[in-house]
Regions:
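N-terminal "domain-start" segment
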Residues: 1-113
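Acidic, proline/glycine-rich low-complexity IDRs
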Residues: 110, 114-180
């Protein structure tokens, strides 16, 4: 028996891939909130807020109820939650983890992981080496936690992970949520 412990080759998205289509497909498979569009001058927090606002995952006007909502009340608070500056050369694994990892239960990441890694690499290339990447914590990309898998919420979900990138005239938002 000849077993190979070599990692498989990277998933090939094809020549000149439509990253928006691939991102949407992975998001559909993994139930993620995603946005890929032009950089229209919004900052990371405002962009994240605007993408999340129509989802029902924000409660900006709540502050007096007994539920104890934990998410941000404004784009400024969302910006403060996105406090981890991810170097562009490290953004691809953050993207892939946010696209596929279950935030509540550890386990299988499914067959879509190689595609998510390819999409992450493609998005990093699209936004370029000068892109500004931000994340709200290490609940998805646990490898970046350095001992503490903490996060600052960007939604009202029990668990959430967000990666937001702006660069080269493009902007991307990827948000995962989980409930236990």
């Amino acid at each position: 028996m000849n077993l190979s412990f070599e990692p498989p080759p990277p998933y090939d998205l094809g020549p000149d891939p439509d990253l928006g289509l691939w991102l949407a497909e992975v998001a559909r498979e993994t139930d993620r909130i995603v946005h890929l569009g032009p950089d229209d001058g919004r900052g990371h927090g405002q962009l994240c807020w605007d993408v999340l606002e129509p989802t029902g995952l924000l409660r900006p006007h709540c502050g007096h109820c007994t539920h104890g909502h934990g998410g941000p009340r404004s784009a400024q608070q969302a910006d403060s939650a996105l406090k981890i500056h991810v170097p562009p050369q490290e953004a691809a694994p953050w993207i892939a983890a946010t696209l596929v990892r279950n935030l509540v239960f550890r386990g299988e990441e499914g067959d879509v992981r190689p595609v998510a890694e390819a999409v992450g690499a493609g998005l990093v290339a699209l936004l370029g080496p000068q892109a500004q990447w931000r994340a709200n914590g290490c609940v998805a990309y646990r490898e970046g936690a350095r001992g503490n898998v903490g996060w600052s919420p960007v939604t009202e979900a029990t668990f959430d992970a967000a990666v937001v990138g702006i660069g080269n005239g493009h902007a991307v938002v990827i948000v995962a949520t989980g409930e236990d």
